Amino acid sequence: MALKREIQGVVLQKAGDKTATILVERRVMHPRYHKFVKRFKKYLVHDEKNETNAGDTIVAVECRPLSARKSFRLKAIVAKGVE
């Protein structure tokens, strides 16, 4: 069995029942200037128990496609956001 990809990001919003939108930041080196620049991407994450709120930092793990855009499940909440 292959290892599942894990991503860590900040919850931007609750996109509906059992779904959260997270923002994942990654750092890549610019090909010409050799400086690290930030790249951002949004993912939809399945939150079975509706545990997350906006501002939380979470870890999500890859799973089978649950909808057209949702392929990650909530694994753990790393830090709670400001209430």
From Swiss-Prot:
NCBIfam families: PRK05610.1, uS17_bact. GO terms for biological process: translation. Pfam families: Ribosomal_S17. Keywords: Ribonucleoprotein, Ribosomal protein, RNA-binding, rRNA-binding. This is Small ribosomal subunit protein uS17. Gene3D superfamilies: Nucleic acid-binding proteins. The keyword Transmembrane does not apply. Part of the 30S ribosomal subunit. GO terms for molecular function: rRNA binding; structural constituent of ribosome. The gene is rpsQ. It comes from Campylobacter curvus (strain 525.92). HAMAP family: Ribosomal_uS17_B. Belongs to the universal ribosomal protein uS17 family. One of the primary rRNA binding proteins, it binds specifically to the 5'-end of 16S ribosomal RNA. InterPro entries: NA-bd_OB-fold, Ribosomal_uS17, Ribosomal_uS17_bact/chlr, Ribosomal_uS17_CS. GO terms for cellular component: cytosolic small ribosomal subunit.
